[in-house]
A protein has these predicted regions:
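A detector of single, family-specific signature residues
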Residues: 1-370
Length: 370
């Protein structure tokens, strides 16, 4: 094989093995299945050397998945290119019902040569670290909710009822400390559930404190601070958005960012009939959930609260102007859509979609180091 050729190398990556296939860039060249290799660095080095004996330019391709981006970061150090592609956007034949590692690797190589794959954005190492910390906080919130549900379900089975106003406030916690269960065994269960709630609460507090500390030295911290100029976008929402998306300005238009977050309507159009449905829900669920949570703040009339004013004081006037423009626009739109009989959840998602555009506009005003 000529040393001037480019090889496209498809890899179906798993925890302990990688299925490998390759094809030359020449039209009509046959896709060759190489076999399965291990996932150690020495196995990857051996594969690179073998492929380099066949061509000078190597392009490795694999699907984004649970194995992360270590291959993407390792292969360029060996002088090769690497693409991470979106598995949900890989073309499939409707009648194809056979799926094996061999077929997947060969398909990746073939589609890479044809240019039919969509490459995903890979975050920098430090950006991914902040994202992991942000997601760990989300996991802690979920675990805390589950622990509270178990405790409340246990008390309900024992017909032990709290008659106060708010759960998990000081009065409720004092009441829990006085609860006596019918039997010693059930008292043990109750105390273990109480301890689980306390442990998950402490874990959540630790992660939130660590996230606050780590973001201070993060290269994208200026964007996090600027996004907090928007109503409903406090620290956790802002850091979730930036950690999950990265540099918002990598999207050329706000609509591209809306599409990435799955906030645009689905559509089925045939002939002269056009149907639009619910949002696509494609893309990043973590960012979309945080965005919708922040959008609920616009159900009230436009107003600069004391907390928002404190955040605005540290920011340039151009960002303050965008913040107020967003409030006026989104609060009016919320009331208008509700008055037309739209469900509150539908309205909030519509507000979230427009809120993304204002986030993009603010991010354009903030210089970010590479």
């Amino acid at each position: 094989m000529s040393q001037s050729r480019t090889l496209f190398i498809g890899m179906d990556v798993h925890k302990d093995s990688i299925a490998v296939a390759y094809v030359a860039q020449d039209h009509g060249a046959e896709v060759i299945y190489l076999g399965a290799i291990g996932t150690r660095q020495c196995d990857i080095d051996q594969l690179v050397r073998k492929m380099q004996s066949k061509a000078k330019h190597l392009i490795f391709v694999y699907e984004a998945g649970p194995c992360g981006y270590w291959l993407y970061r390792y292969l360029p150090r060996k002088g090769s290119d690497c693409w991470v592609v979106a598995p949900s956007l890989i073309p499939h034949k409707p009648g194809d019902r056979v799926k094996t590692d061999r077929r997947d690797a060969m398909q990746l190589a073939r589609l890479a040569r044809a240019g039919d794959l969509t490459v995903v954005y890979v975050p920098k190492v430090e950006d991914e670290a902040i994202r992991d910390l942000s997601r760990a906080r989300e996991d802690a919130i979920s675990d805390l909710k589950d622990a509270k549900f178990r405790l409340k379900a246990f008390l309900l089975r024992q017909d032990i009822r709290y008659v106060g106003r708010a759960n998990w406030g000081p009065a409720h916690l004092r009441w829990l400390s006085e609860v006596v269960c019918p039997t010693p065994a059930q008292q043990i269960v109750f105390q273990e559930y109480i301890r689980a709630v306390q442990e998950h609460t402490e874990r959540l507090q630790r992660l939130e404190q660590e996230l606050q500390a780590q973001v201070q030295s993060w290269r994208l911290n200026p964007v996090v601070e600027a996004l907090q100029a928007l109503r409903g976008v406090q620290f956790t929402v802002a850091v979730t958005m930036v950690a999950e998306i990265g540099d918002l300005t990598r999207f050329d238009t706000p609509r591209e960012l809306m599409k990435f977050l799955g906030l645009i309507p689905s559509e089925y159009t045939s002939a002269e009939r056009r149907r639009q449905g619910s949002i696509t829900k494609a893309g990043n669920t973590h960012a979309r959930r945080a965005l919708v949570e922040g959008a609920w703040a616009y159900r009230y009339p436009a107003k600069v609260s004391r907390h928002l004013q404190l955040r605005l004081e540290k920011l340039p006037k151009v960002i303050q102007d965008i913040s107020w423009k967003a409030q006026v626009r989104l609060c009016q739109r919320y009331r208008r859509l509700v008055s037309r009989g739209k469900h509150a959840n539908v309205v909030t998602v519509a507000i979230a979609r427009e809120l993304v555009g204002f986030m993009w506009a603010i991010a354009k005003q903030v210089p970010v180091t590479a």
